Regions:
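Flexible hinge/capping segments at coil-to-helix
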Residues: 124-142
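Hydrophobic residues within well-ordered alpha-helices
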Residues: 65, 87-88, 135, 180-181, ...
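Ligand-binding cleft/hinge of the Venus flytrap
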Residues: 47-48, 62-69, 150-169, 199-203, ...
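A ligand-binding cleft/hinge motif common to bilobed small-molecule-binding domains
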Residues: 82-85, 98-107, 153-156, 179-213
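Periplasmic-binding protein-like
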Residues: 39, 117-126, 192, 196-237, ...
C-alpha cells in the first residue's frame, strides 16, 4: 500500500512539473545560454586534457537540464575571480560550476535552489604530521584558490582570531595541491571533492580534517533572470528524480 501511494505521489509530482514546464514562456525554446565555468575545478567543472572540451559533473548536469527544458547551453571556461563580473556584464548567462551560495554573493546575483553540499578540508602531504590545530596555530604557508568562499571565510576568521599562517593564492585547487606536493606550501584549504579527486588520481596528499561550515552549491544568475531560474530549478528537480543523476554521481564522485 505504501509503495503504491509513493509511486502515485511521484507520478503526480512529475505531472505537475511537466505542466509547469509547458507554462513557461517561450524564451527557453531555441535559446542558447552561456554557462561560465572554472577551467580547473574537478570533479565539477574542468577542461578535459585529452579532448580540450569542458567536462565535469556540473557541465554534464547542465547539458542534460538544457536538453530536458528545451534550450541549449555553451560552457565557457574563464578565470574564477572574474566570473561574477562576467555574469553581470552579460558575457555569460549563468555559473553552474561548483559555486557556493554566500550572503556576499547573493547581494549581486540570485541563486538556484541548492543542488550539492560539500565540506571544507585541509590538505597536506600524505606523510605530513600537521594537524588542523597545527595549521591554524603555526606560521606556515597555506594555499587557497583566489575568489572562493572558503578563502574569504578563512581570511575573515584569521583577522578575528589572529592565526599566524600566510595565505598563498592560486588560480585553482589543483595548483594549490601541486605546491603542497613540491613543498612550496605546507598545506591547502579547499572544498572536499577536489581533494578527493586528486587523491583518487594518485596524488600523495591527504585530508587532515574539516573546518568551518559546509558549502551549498547553486547556479548563479542575474537577479532579473527569474524565468531562467525557474527553468533551472525545475530542471534540477527532474534530474534528481532521473536515473542519470545516479550515473553522474557514480562517474564523478569518487567517495
Amino acid at each position: 500500500m505504501e509503495a503504491a501511494f509513493a509511486e502515485d505521489r511521484m507520478k503526480k509530482i512529475l505531472l505537475l512539473l511537466a505542466l509547469f514546464c509547458l507554462s513557461l514562456p517561450s524564451l527557453a525554446h531555441a535559446k542558447n545560454y552561456i554557462n561560465g565555468i572554472d577551467p580547473n575545478y574537478p570533479p565539477f567543472a574542468y577542461v578535459d586534457e585529452k579532448t580540450g572540451q569542458p567536462s565535469g559533473f556540473d557541465v554534464d548536469a547542465m547539458t542534460w537540464i538544457a536538453k530536458k527544458m528545451g534550450f541549449s547551453v555553451t560552457h565557457k571556461p574563464m578565470a574564477w575571480d572574474g566570473i561574477i563580473p562576467a555574469l553581470k556584464a552579460r558575457e555569460i548567462d549563468m555559473i553552474c560550476s561548483g559555486m557556493s551560495i554566500t550572503e556576499e554573493r547573493a547581494k549581486v546575483v540570485q541563486f538556484s535552489n541548492p543542488y550539492w553540499e560539500v565540506s571544507r578540508v585541509f590538505v597536506t602531504k600524505a606523510n605530513s604530521t600537521l594537524t588542523p590545530k597545527d595549521i591554524l596555530s603555526k606560521p606556515i604557508k597555506l594555499g587557497v584558490q583566489r575568489g572562493t568562499s572558503e578563502a574569504a571565510a578563512l581570511k575573515s576568521e584569521q583577522q578575528k582570531m589572529g592565526y599566524p599562517f600566510t595565505f598563498s593564492y592560486y588560480d585553482s585547487a589543483p595548483l594549490a595541491i601541486e605546491d603542497v606536493l613540491n613543498g612550496r606550501i605546507e598545506a591547502a584549504f579547499m572544498d572536499e571533492l577536489p581533494a578527493d579527486d586528486a587523491i583518487s588520481k594518485g596524488s600523495k596528499v591527504k585530508k587532515v580534517g574539516t573546518h568551518g561550515k559546509p558549502d551549498n552549491f547553486g547556479v548563479a544568475l542575474r537577479k532579473e533572470d527569474t524565468e531562467l531560474r525557474k527553468l533551472i530549478d525545475t530542471g534540477f528537480t527532474l534530474l534528481m528524480a532521473d536515473p542519470y543523476w545516479k550515473e553522474l554521481r557514480a562517474k564523478y564522485m569518487k567517495k
